[in-house]
Swiss-Prot record:
Distribution of this protein across tissues and organs: Highly expressed in roots, especially in the cortex.
Task of the protein: 2-oxoglutarate (OG)- and Fe(II)-dependent dioxygenase (2OGD) involved in scopoletin biosynthesis. Converts feruloyl CoA into 6'-hydroxyferuloyl CoA but has no activity with ferulic acid, feruloylquinic acid, caffeic acid, caffeoyl CoA, p-coumaric acid, cinnamic acid, cinnamoyl CoA or benzoyl CoA. Required for the production and secretion of compounds (e.g. fluorescent coumarins) that facilitate the mobilization and uptake of iron from sources with low bioavailability or in high pH-induced iron deficiency conditions.
Gene3D superfamilies listed in its UniProt record: B-lactam Antibiotic, Isopenicillin N Synthase, Chain (2.60.120.330)
GO biological process: coumarin biosynthetic process; hydrogen peroxide-mediated programmed cell death; phenylpropanoid biosynthetic process; response to iron ion starvation
GO molecular-function term, one example from the UniProt record: metal ion binding
Organism from which the protein derives: Arabidopsis thaliana
Pfam hit, one: 2OG-FeII_Oxy
Reported pH dependence: Optimum pH is 6.5.
Pathway this chain belongs to: Phenylpropanoid metabolism
Protein name listed in UniProt: Feruloyl CoA ortho-hydroxylase 1
CC cofactor note: Binds 1 Fe(2+) ion per subunit.
Gene for this chain: F6'H1
Cited PROSITE patterns: FE2OG_OXY
Cofactor entry: L-ascorbate; Fe(2+)
Residues engaged in binding 2-oxoglutarate: Y220, R303, S305
Amino acid sequence: MAPTLLTTQFSNPAEVTDFVVYKGNGVKGLSETGIKALPEQYIQPLEERLINKFVNETDEAIPVIDMSNPDEDRVAEAVCDAAEKWGFFQVINHGVPLEVLDDVKAATHKFFNLPVEEKRKFTKENSLSTTVRFGTSFSPLAEQALEWKDYLSLFFVSEAEAEQFWPDICRNETLEYINKSKKMVRRLLEYLGKNLNVKELDETKESLFMGSIRVNLNYYPICPNPDLTVGVGRHSDVSSLTILLQDQIGGLHVRSLASGNWVHVPPVAGSFVINIGDAMQIMSNGLYKSVEHRVLANGYNNRISVPIFVNPKPESVIGPLPEVIANGEEPIYRDVLYSDYVKYFFRKAHDGKKTVDYAKI
């Protein structure tokens, strides 16, 4: 039998939705009311819940790559191999100062610990900029079952724009996180590009691979019935590359291309989790894989993560790169306007890998 909401604060599901979504309390606010059972709108269909027997059955693990290895060719080979076989890998000794990572994680907690009146200033209805958005779940109006996550989404336009519109309490730390990560991001994209016969990351390719940046500050509060819901549902990212900083709680799972199992990505202190996005899969004509992943809810700890989504410019047209199909390889994707692709992704609920079909020939 489905659990019911065991608190007198809400008399029906509509009141929960109003409290969480429209009044800006998020699931953090809901969790802090002391609810003892999961509201019905968060209960996922059975097939969307992650059953333990499908996790790590084969002791699979995504690759961990040491970027300080002096053999540059070896590092590049490991990155490209992981991009082809896993679509995910972790990097250590990446050159981003650890204090920068600690600072942005602390700033994430500070933002979500603000009074709801302060956070509400950044909801879709109240934000002074379309580049700043505080919200909950993924796409509440399109979802049959909501996800147990709150977020602050920050689309980087310029430091001046960020100074004007981003929340004071996390702005400087997030900008520093972006700036200190750029060298590593460029290095990874150069490796991936050279393997696609892209000789250099010139201005045109830079615009295509990393022309826009979005950062999310994600918050996954303690959940009363974590086995019945998800923090984030099955999906692949629409980015070229995603750079994920996670705390020590864990919960990220990746679908193995080899076995189909869900594989936990254990937190490694000071590391980043890197994953290929749909845009890179399309531009590589399917050589690099954007892979399904999801995040579990948990009943013991509040969790945060801070992904940087490295994207083409919205006005870019993405399709198989000329360098990839120059030798006669048949394109399996058509050219699409990147902003159209992103709009298609965000107007529906998470649905695994279906978004990339939008670009298939």
